[in-house]
Regions:
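A generic structural signal for beta-strand entry/edge sites
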Residues: 9, 27-31, 201
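Short secondary-structure boundary/hinge segments and terminal tails
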Residues: 1, 62-64, 181
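Glycine-rich N-terminal segment of FAD-binding domains in flavoprotein oxidoreductases
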Residues: 1-17, 32, 52-54
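FAD-binding subdomain of flavoenzyme oxidoreductases
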Residues: 19-23, 28-175
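Short glycine-enriched loops at secondary-structure junctions
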Residues: 15-17, 126, 179, 230
Length: 267
């Protein structure tokens, strides 16, 4: 809630709107209340043999309504896109109290405005999201994860293309600087994962059957590869612990900034 001068702020919780519907196997969709957590939706999809494309480290506290209101990206944007790409229907209460409901999940629908696209990313300025209809995906299968030491951001970003073999599907690509790697490791008692220290470390995850065949041209680099689930979770922890690791230092100022890759490569 945003306080207005001379008025008491109002805080509205959607936590009790937490029902997750059954997966519609015919359309590959699921309906969920705004208060359901991202983890709830992902587990419901997985139990039915499907996969929800948005994932965050805060999956068990982030609500679906919140991820839609902010158009959350998460760690699999390169494979599945932002939250807006998953949204096929929405229900919301407008400022005047009217309820807008489009939860049928029809992909071929040109009847007027795309309210989902308008409300997604609006952060509550256009209405309060109460339920959503989401697109699901078939699981990518077994994957391989690699941490690769890099000397520049240009090299790190280049690996997102040159480091992936033809025919393999890139599932995730993350770039972490040396400070972030060190802090995450210190927080969880993990050693530096590579032979040498590097200013930048790139995390790549590819769908390749889980045998590392999806990587290309990284054998001569400083690299560690995880094939089993426990080793992959350990490598991912260096990325997923970033927020917690920096917060442990004291008051932090966090910004979610998007820049074109060529610009980032110049850093």
């Amino acid at each position: 809630a945003e306080p207005v001068a001379g008025r008491l702020p109002v805080i509205l919780s959607t936590r009790r709107l937490d029902v997750v519907g059954a997966v519609d196997g015919l359309s590959g969709q699921i309906t969920a209340g705004a208060g359901a957590t991202l983890g709830d939706v992902r587990r419901a999809a997985q139990a039915a043999g499907w996969y929800y494309g948005v994932d965050l480290a805060a999956r068990d506290s982030a609500t679906i309504g919140g991820t839609v209101a902010t158009n959350a990206g998460g760690i699999h944007v390169v494979a599945y896109g932002m939250t807006r790409a998953q949204l096929v229907g929405i229900e919301a209460v407008l400022p005047d109290g009217r309820v807008v409901s489009h939860l049928a999940g029809m992909l071929k629908d040109n009847t007027g405005y795309d309210f989902g696209a308008l409300l997604c990313g609006s952060e509550g300025t256009l209405g309060v999201i109460t339920a959503v209809r989401l697109r699901l995906h078939r699981p990518a299968g077994r994957t391989s994860v690699a941490l690769v030491g890099c000397e520049t951001y240009e090299q790190a970003i280049g690996l997102m293309s040159s480091g992936v073999a033809s025919g393999a599907r890139l599932i995730a690509a993350e770039v972490i600087d040396e400070t972030g790697m060190e802090l995450a490791g210190r927080l969880h008692g993990l050693p530096w994962p590579l032979r040498n220290r590097h200013p930048v470390v790139t995390l790549l995850e590819v769908a390749d059957g889980g045998d590392a065949s999806g990587f290309s041209g990284i054998d001569d680099l400083d690299v560690v590869v995880g094939l089993d689930a426990s080793e992959q979770a350990r490598l991912w922890l260096y990325r997923e612990a970033q927020g917690e690791a920096f917060s442990a230092l004291g008051v932090t100022h966090k910004l979610d900034v998007s820049v074109p890759l060529p610009v980032l490569a110049q850093c």
